[in-house]
Amino acid sequence: MIRSELIQIVADENPHLYQRDVERIVNTVFEEIIEAMSNGDRVELRGFGAFSVKHRDARTGRNPRTGEAVAVEAKSVPFFKTGKLLRDRLNGKED
């Protein structure tokens, strides 16, 4: 599913909302998640999961073609941990 499909589904399920308003809401939700993570905050959506930032230390990697050692800089990467409700649903354990 892509963002436009999500917007369409939400708009279809909420006929009292205009599609452009749904689009603004969805975009705002994503922007707020991105902003919080940019500040190093964790974003938890109960039952769905939690978005957080993991820090990777600098390390020495290898160029796969040449085998030459390469310095890999420290970096921050997004991380998502699924919530119990989502995990259970994916594994067919719905209530």
Swiss-Prot record:
The record ties this protein, via Gene3D superfamilies, to: IHF-like DNA-binding proteins
Q: Which UniProt keywords apply?
A: DNA recombination, DNA-binding, Transcription, Transcription regulation, Translation regulation
- Which Gene Ontology molecular function entries are recorded, alphabetically? DNA binding; structural constituent of chromatin
PROSITE patterns according to UniProt: HISTONE_LIKE
Cross-referenced Pfam families: Bac_DNA_binding
**A GO biological-process term:** regulation of DNA-templated transcription
Identify the GO cellular component terms for this protein. chromosome; cytosol
The record, for SUPFAM superfamilies, names:
IHF-like DNA-binding proteins (SSF47729)
Subunit comment = Heterodimer of an alpha and a beta chain.
Q: What's the family?
A: Belongs to the bacterial histone-like protein family.
Role noted for this protein:
This protein is one of the two subunits of integration host factor, a specific DNA-binding protein that functions in genetic recombination as well as in transcriptional and translational control.
Q: What is the protein's given name? A: Integration host factor subunit beta
